[in-house]
């Protein structure tokens, strides 16, 4: 019944297996990939015809982690998987980015790639497995795909690169100082197509070495997919790339001069209007048949790209008048918003971000329900890209994939310089509002995020800056690397290469390649040029940091204390009675962790001290030999009970009240009376033994034997 094809190989410490022919046989391509006990199914389907008038490539990549894969039931009211999580969205983008450029140019039929996590061993991250499964499914589906690709994850420990570190190793690099890199690389047999990373101030050489190492490690996987496809691939879809050379010639003849003049305008808005006018003039000169051609958009883009690229490669001149290495003018300001905890406005040319930092308590941490466990995150970065930032009218609503991806890139860049949670026990939320955009808005978020956190008083290890690099690569091998690219240069160029870091090294690298043939030499030049740009931006940012506040007066103060774990129950009390009383009396917010760390938060220092003292009185143990001030709570025939240490009571035996015989303790004591007592010790049953007679009741000083004898002699 089943015609199953299976291929396996040893990859690092695990076995990688590809299988097809048993599940989802009606899909154009279906592959189940297994690494260890992590298993992902990828299914590919594509339309046989292009929709009329469609002038773009409608590729959709969907990635979903099923809770049953890890033996879990989804949370929430409905108890089923719902909208994509951040991890699912980022993984879908991770798969989309390297495969999109590899479809045959001109192919615009709808393609759907669906990756479903079926099993997760909590060791091997399913994102890499999904990428390999998707590549294999595309390769056998018959769709015009110039792959395959493969991907891997690389760590960096003690100067050594590590292939596919475990999920636990990559959970939080701040808590694992030995692990300095989380890098994902995807590529073909000949070229690197995509890089995504989070690093702890690696040098350019270390980062380039990691990418090179990763590309070498994916070669056996590419070979495995090729041999797998040789046994089970379907017949290639009959597709001939469209020939629109005549249409392009007509477009070029009708408006090259006007389009070239439009691209000579340095102001973005004026240039955009002039380019739009040139397009309309070209369309007006074309025939109805040419206007109806579905490749008109491609012909116009080819004309625009030729003008922009030719000027850069041949003359070294960019559309805004800069050379290839110059960063646009920068203005950095902090402390703009009076009631926020920290704020910054970062402007670079026609790209601008208003970035705001808010400091919260442990209650504000983000709870994440993932396949590999539940955990909390105390650093959040949200990126918003409203339509007005590019002068357009558009959809306003929940963040899209692009906004989530850009926010995570900025998050990775800043994560490396954050203080340890034990040193700075705040939840940090950074929001980047992109108010203007003409390229590299994610890197503006990095710069603005660094400034706003410093304005809020977050003790960052160093300021972080980011810059977006571009590439123009011609067919003859000539190329130009561009620093701080514009939106048009990103759209019409061959590479988007974002680098963020400190003065000491790189904290984040993201690269997307639109063409094959990116050599190590080009990558090395791009990294070197990016470092120069980063240093320039950091110098400009430092001009704004001199006025940064030490700590926002509007932010809550947090003090931490450690208590024994066996005392947690006493602090909470039956049904939470004790902790509620502490919060009500002190006015502070109190968070208790399972490890005994307590965070006390309040804008008022007196409130924090009151809560601290109340907790300390519950958990602290009285010391033998110390003198305490207490209050008589009960009088009995054989002595008096004194509350002397928090809620702790002890017995002052009648013989320990005074240096004379008493008929009854009530002769000298009454309930509510304040007395000073010395802790003599504990009896066999753990009961507290106190003494009043060895303490001067006026001064609180202990009466030593010499003083006692002298007083008796008098």
UniProtKB/Swiss-Prot annotation:
One of its GO terms (cellular component) is cytosol. Residues 625-693 form the S1 motif domain. GO terms for molecular function: 3'-5'-RNA exonuclease activity; magnesium ion binding; polyribonucleotide nucleotidyltransferase activity; RNA binding. Its cofactor is Mg(2+). Keywords: Cytoplasm, Magnesium, Metal-binding, Nucleotidyltransferase, RNA-binding, Transferase. Gene3D superfamilies: GHMP Kinase, N-terminal domain, K Homology domain, type 1, Nucleic acid-binding proteins. It holds the Pfam family RNase_PH. Mg(2+) binds at residues 490, 496. It is found in: Cytoplasm. It catalyses: RNA(n+1) + phosphate = RNA(n) + a ribonucleoside 5'-diphosphate. One of its GO terms (biological process) is RNA processing. Belongs to the polyribonucleotide nucleotidyltransferase family. Involved in mRNA degradation. Catalyzes the phosphorolysis of single-stranded polyribonucleotides processively in the 3'- to 5'-direction. This is Polyribonucleotide nucleotidyltransferase. The lineage of its organism: Bacteria, Pseudomonadati, Pseudomonadota, Alphaproteobacteria, Rhodobacterales.
């Amino acid at each position: 019944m089943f015609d199953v094809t299976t291929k396996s190989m040893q990859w690092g410490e695990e076995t990688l297996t590809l299988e097809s022919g048993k599940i989802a046989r009606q899909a154009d391509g279906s592959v189940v990939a297994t690494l260890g006990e992590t298993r992902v199914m990828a299914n590919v389907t594509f339309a046989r015809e292009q929709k009329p008038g469609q002038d773009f490539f409608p590729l959709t990549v969907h990635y979903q982690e099923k809770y049953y894969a890890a033996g879990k039931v989804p949370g929430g009211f409905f108890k089923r998987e719902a909208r994509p999580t951040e991890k699912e969205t980022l993984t879908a983008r991770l798969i989309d980015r390297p495969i999109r450029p590899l479809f045959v140019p001109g192919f615009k039929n709808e393609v759907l790639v669906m990756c479903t996590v079926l099993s997760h061993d909590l060791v091997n991250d399913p994102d890499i497995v999904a990428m390999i499964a998707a590549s294999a499914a595309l390769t056998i589906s018959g769709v015009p795909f110039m792959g395959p690709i493969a991907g891997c994850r690389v760590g960096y420990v003690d100067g050594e690169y590590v292939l596919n570190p475990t999920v636990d190793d990559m959970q939080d690099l701040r808590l694992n100082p030995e692990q300095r890199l989380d890098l994902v690389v995807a590529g073909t047999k000949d070229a690197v197509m995509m890089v995504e990373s989070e690093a702890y101030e690696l040098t350019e050489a270390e980062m380039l070495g990691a990418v090179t190492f990763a590309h070498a490690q994916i070669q056996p996987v590419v070979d495995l997919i090729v041999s797998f496809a040789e046994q089970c691939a379907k017949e290639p879809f009959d597709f001939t790339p469209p020939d629109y050379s005549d249409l392009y010639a007509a477009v070029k003849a009708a408006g090259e001069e006007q389009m070239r003049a439009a691209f000579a305008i340095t102001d973005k808005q004026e240039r955009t209007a002039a380019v739009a006018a040139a397009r309309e003039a070209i369309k007006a000169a074309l025939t109805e048949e040419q206007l109806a051609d579905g490749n008109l958009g491609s012909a116009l883009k080819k004309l625009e790209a030729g003008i922009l690229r030719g000027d850069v490669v041949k003359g070294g001149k960019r559309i805004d008048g800069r050379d290839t290495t110059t960063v646009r003018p920068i203005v950095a300001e902090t402390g703009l918003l009076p009631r926020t905890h920290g704020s910054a406005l970062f402007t670079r040319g026609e790209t601008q971000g208003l970035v705001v930092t808010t400091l919260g308590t442990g209650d504000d941490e983000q709870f994440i329900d993932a396949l590999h466990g539940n955990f909390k995150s105390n650093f959040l970065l949200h990126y918003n890209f409203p339509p007005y930032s590019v002068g357009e009218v558009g959809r306003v609503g929940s963040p899209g994939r692009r906004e989530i991806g850009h926010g995570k890139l900025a998050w990775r860049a800043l994560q490396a310089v954050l203080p340890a949670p034990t040193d700075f026990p705040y939840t940090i939320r950074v929001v980047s509002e992109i108010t203007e955009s003409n390229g590299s808005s994610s890197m503006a978020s990095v710069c603005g995020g660094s400034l706003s956190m410093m304005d809020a008083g977050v003790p960052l290890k160093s300021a972080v800056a980011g810059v977006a690099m571009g590439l123009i690569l011609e067919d003859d091998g000539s190329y130009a690397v561009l620093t701080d690219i514009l939106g048009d240069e990103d759209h019409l160029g061959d590479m988007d290469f974002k680098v963020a870091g400190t003065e000491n090294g790189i904290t984040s690298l993201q690269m997307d390649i639109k063409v094959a043939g990116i050599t190590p030499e080009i990558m090395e030049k791009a990294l070197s040029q990016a470092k120069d740009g980063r240093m320039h931006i950091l110098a400009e940012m430092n001009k704004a940091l001199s006025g940064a506040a030490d700590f926002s007066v509007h932010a809550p103060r947090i003090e931490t204390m450690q208590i024994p774990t066996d005392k947690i129950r006493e602090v909470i009390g039956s049904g939470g009675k004790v902790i509620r009383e502490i919060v009500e009396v002190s006015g502070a917010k109190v968070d208790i962790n399972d490890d005994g760390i307590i965070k006390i938060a309040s804008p008022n220092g007196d409130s924090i001290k009151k809560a601290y003292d109340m907790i300390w009185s519950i958990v602290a143990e009285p010391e033998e030999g110390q003198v305490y001030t207490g209050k008589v709570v009960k009088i009995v025939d054989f002595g008096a009970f004194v509350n002397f240490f928090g809620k702790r009571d002890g017995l002052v035996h009648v013989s320990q009240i005074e240096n004379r015989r008493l008929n009854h303790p009530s002769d000298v004591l009454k309930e509510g009376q304040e007395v000073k007592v010395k802790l003599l010790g504990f009896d066999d049953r753990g009961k507290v033994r106190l003494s009043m007679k060895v303490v001067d009741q006026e001064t609180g000083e202990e009466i030593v034997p010499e003083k006692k004898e002298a007083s008796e002699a008098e």
